[in-house]
Amino acid sequence: MKIRKKKMKLKGKVKKYLMDKLNDNEKLHFSLLDPFKINSSEELKYIAKNLYNVGTDAFLIGGTLGVSKDKLDFVISLLDDYEIPKIIFPSNINLLSEKADALLFLSLLNSDDIYYVIGAQIVAAPIIKMLQMEVIPTAYVIVGHGGTAAHIGKARVIPYDNFELATAYTLAAEYLGMDFVYLEAGSGAPEPIRPEMISFIKKASSIPLIIGGGIRSVEVALKLVEAGANIIVTGNIIERDVDKAIKIIRGIKNK
């Protein structure tokens, strides 16, 4: 069990925190918590404590449907005791809160709707400035199954086996100055991003890759890490079987 001190101030320092770890060749894990799917504060506290103690590197808070500002703030407040970053993973401009340590400032690059590429970002920018939130510019690219995120975001999903297209998107994100590329197979996807896609991309680009969607076992997570994934995100498995999520985190952090 990995016990860490609490109450380290992270506001304004989240990007540095992440980059320092990546520069030390650490492989990171983010725990994605959907406020809409959390049934009670006791459940959240139990889950968060276990994820934290085995070494998850950050809490991502967000969901595609049903998340109110009050529920978002409530969840972030319950996570306040833990020294790792609380990062908002927004689906729209309603998911902004000064209580968070940072915000993934996402652009859904393969959306057919300009709103999700740059429109929402323009609307959100003055609010983010007013709230003095730290932003982490991140290209969001949906692959394969895509799930609800692809449907809502009107994404032209990249086929699982189209490595060249995924690489082109990654290079475009790098040249646009993004800090990260988040390759998303979708919540509950029947298949995760393929390791072969990650290794293909890594031959062309050094931008850090966040990989999420369909990761249900430590074996799958380790294959993604070995292929070059820098950050693994799990969410659905946390909701369904926290013990499996714990095994995934242990595997990644002991790699």
Swiss-Prot record:
Names of the cofactor(s): Mg(2+)
Biological process according to GO: glycerophospholipid biosynthetic process
EC number: 2.5.1.41
A GO term for molecular function: phosphoglycerol geranylgeranyltransferase activity
GO cellular component terms listed in the entry, alphabetical order: cytoplasm
Family: Belongs to the GGGP/HepGP synthase family. Group II subfamily.
Family annotation (PANTHER family): HEPTAPRENYLGLYCERYL PHOSPHATE SYNTHASE, PTHR40029
Designated name of the protein: Geranylgeranylglyceryl phosphate synthase
